[in-house]
Amino acid sequence: MNLTKTQRQLHNFLTLAQEAGSLSKLAKLCGYRTPVALYKLKQRLEKQAEDPDARGIRPSLMAKLEKHTGKPKGWLDRKHRERTVPETAAESTGTAETQIAETASAAGCRSVTVNRNTCETQITVSINLDGSGKSRLDTGVPFLEHMIDQIARHGMIDIDISCKGDLHIDDHHTAEDIGITLGQAIRQALGDKKGIRRYGHSYVPLDEALSRVVIDLSGRPGLVYNIEFTRALIGRFDVDLFEEFFHGIVNHSMMTLHIDNLSGKNAHHQAETVFKAFGRALRMAVEHDPRMAGQTPSTKGTLTA
């Protein structure tokens, strides 16, 4: 069977990941801070595999991969004999395809890490849109962490956030910048948005409180925010900062977001219903619809332009 250049390079690239133990370990071996670039490379090679004119892996990247894995020059571009992976390696790491599938969905990379550093905040956000609802949050703002945990748990999205902010001033920059960075992560993880449902909505009650959230991953940022909190502070947290947080998400994920608190007397309940509903609506919107068969849910043919 004659392989295209891209098919041959993809096969050898996956072999490198297999030998390293996973694509994440290969990225670390090659000096990358996160594996995002290599996941995107894999996704591109898979899309172009059948195209005999595709450019494949660029020479500079090929040289970098070969250098850091101890392969001779040109190794990625040559056909090699199939060889069996040692049993111990297979048991400890699984195949490269298995490792990749654990971190990226069948439709491409849906797990990313974003770093954002300013004079006011230093933030790292990692998300997995196809996760299990786990969160690890270290922001210095406990009530905001409690709310973001609701997004993770009800959205079935793994969220890891580390933030060092200028809390000696107040929580404003921290809340806003976490929203910005989380929005950037959502946008990157969604990629070209092919096959997703695009729209999501949820009503969530908590005792006397009821909130509705509606999402459109349209590529057009817009926030409609209707919440009249019954008090200005929840503990020490300024409730005005919730709107700043959601503005950050909306403007950097490029989503349209409608938030309506329909009833509520307890401010904690009001906030919690909003964040739970947002998580559930986001889960619906990012899910892959098998009936879409990888198509973009838009008559324009794109949700990223």
Swiss-Prot record:
Whether Amino-acid biosynthesis counts among this entry's keywords is yes
Pathway the protein contributes to = Amino-acid biosynthesis; L-histidine biosynthesis; L-histidine from 5-phospho-alpha-D-ribose 1-diphosphate: step 6/9
- Entry superkingdom: Bacteria
Entry's Gene Ontology cellular component terms = cytoplasm
Q: Report the EC number(s), separated by commas if there are several.
A: 4.2.1.19
A Pfam family the protein falls into: IGPD
Query: Where's it found, cell-wise?
Result: Cytoplasm
Q: What is this protein called?
A: Imidazoleglycerol-phosphate dehydratase
Q: Could you tell me the gene encoding this protein? A: hisB
Q: Which UniProt keywords apply?
A: Amino-acid biosynthesis, Cytoplasm, Histidine biosynthesis, Lyase
